[in-house]
């Protein structure tokens, strides 16, 4: 399993208010969600009308598929009406089956007796 993450910075030079910025961001997020299997959210500097930071995540069974989807998002971001793509950061990581993730896998974490002393009567 591979997880692709991307952080976009989109400048919105004509935004005079947060409402102007939200209009541009919502339109972009809706278009991305309609066309691509990604999760997308604003991730920083929510109070500045002139720039929006968006985080995206995708899960796929091949790195090439993650890369293809993230590239499609970046292509869409390059043509955002009223926006200018200012920065892009992407990373694809392997998880499970030889990849790095939770040490010894989530199964080991779940089988640990971390909650062994929990007594339901103590609620």
What does each of the following model-derived ranges do?
Residues 2-123:
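Long, contiguous binding/interaction regions
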């Amino acid at each position: 399993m591979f997880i692709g993450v991307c952080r976009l910075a989109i400048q919105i030079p004509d935004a005079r208010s947060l409402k102007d910025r939200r209009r541009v961001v919502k339109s972009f997020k809706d278009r991305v969600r309609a066309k691509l299997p990604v999760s997308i959210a604003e991730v920083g500097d929510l109070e500045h009308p002139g720039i929006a930071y968006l985080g995206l995540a995708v899960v796929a069974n091949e790195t090439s598929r993650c890369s293809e989807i993230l590239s499609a998002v970046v292509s869409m971001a390059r043509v955002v009406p009223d926006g200018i793509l200012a920065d892009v950061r992407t990373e694809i990581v392997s998880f499970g089956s030889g990849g790095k993730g939770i040490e010894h896998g989530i199964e080991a974490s779940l089988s640990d007796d971390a909650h062994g002393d929990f007594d339901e009567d103590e609620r």
